[in-house]
């Protein structure tokens, strides 16, 4: 009886949803031939909470605390997009000081998000040390957030027409001190990581995406810029007051995991440049458009002295969304975060469609990991930078 020396059976392995490298409750059904990946199927939905449907039963002000639960590591961006949509719909002007404060908060949030990408990404590929260093810097950021907004995470700070509160006394000096300190921290990261031969062995040439391919897949953010496409919505859409600052779009042309790392590291230093200019040039004036509080009231005298109506047992400003539709987007740390809003002359949105960057960037994962080694899945998935809260919504 002849027994074959080798068997060519394919093995199907479940990675996740409770795997330390899955960055949340992501499940990958991986088909393996030995160490080689033949197929990979992501299974989503474990963190689905019906965020779009909830929006249709809440006013914008009531909905604001919910949106910080999409991408819970960069909550300022979800708040920004939530107030930008009704501001554009109602043509509400944001005071210059409020716009500067928003930019400061957005860039601090971008740094915090990139830091918490960097640590776990390095841990995924076997480097534990940076994981502890990033929390040192991130703690300083969260102290700044807590001083300005009262919350370390889930800040609920943005409002239609401005922000919830002005910056406290001494906060700007404290933030400038952080900027000076953090620049030395980024140099330290680059010394520790960028030329490390073991790190380069793991990431160089792994998960290559060409420029045209990135556009065809609808990628955005560092995923797109690492493939040679100089596309940043802060330059393209001119929202808030980014045009008033001197900064450059960071990009690389290689399109591999190393390029995505380099883009994010460079973006942190650019964010510091924007922060320093904004903090030194912040104008005086109101932090909120008080005209925006004088919402359209019914002619009924019963409402003449009230800015609030009771809707589903919660007081909420009577800001009616006019019957039109628009798409609003911001450059979040992970890519293009967008909202498609349809108003219906009601205080509730008729449709609130979320365009999450993580969900769309994740679609290319099966294409990238095919014919790679099993260990490369961690590197490629880590370089995409996903948060399951916004992927599943």
UniProtKB/Swiss-Prot annotation:
GO molecular function: NAD binding; oxidoreductase activity, acting on NAD(P)H, quinone or similar compound as acceptor; quinone binding
Residues annotated as transmembrane: none
Membrane-related topology note: Peripheral membrane protein
Keywords: Chloroplast, Membrane, NAD, NADP, Plastid, Plastoquinone, Quinone, Thylakoid, Translocase, Transport
Its biological purpose: NDH shuttles electrons from NAD(P)H:plastoquinone, via FMN and iron-sulfur (Fe-S) centers, to quinones in the photosynthetic chain and possibly in a chloroplast respiratory chain. The immediate electron acceptor for the enzyme in this species is believed to be plastoquinone. Couples the redox reaction to proton translocation, and thus conserves the redox energy in a proton gradient.
Signal peptide: none
Gene3D superfamilies recorded: Cytochrome-c3 Hydrogenase, chain B (1.10.645.10)
Quaternary structure (record): NDH is composed of at least 16 different subunits, 5 of which are encoded in the nucleus.
Location in the cell: Plastid, Chloroplast thylakoid membrane
Domain of life: Eukaryota
NCBIfam families: PRK06075.1 (NF004739), PRK07415.1 (NF005649)
Catalytic activity reported: a plastoquinone + NADH + (n+1) H(+)(in) = a plastoquinol + NAD(+) + n H(+)(out); a plastoquinone + NADPH + (n+1) H(+)(in) = a plastoquinol + NADP(+) + n H(+)(out)
Name of the molecule in the record: NAD(P)H-quinone oxidoreductase subunit H, chloroplastic
Species classification: Eukaryota, Viridiplantae, Streptophyta, Embryophyta, Tracheophyta
Cellular component terms per the entry's GO annotation: chloroplast thylakoid membrane
UniProt-listed Enzyme Commission number(s): 7.1.1.-
InterPro entries per UniProt: NADH_Q_OxRdtase_suD (IPR001135), NADH_UbQ_OxRdtase_49kDa_CS (IPR014029), NDH1_su_D/H (IPR022885), NiFe-Hase_large (IPR029014)
Top-level enzyme category: translocase
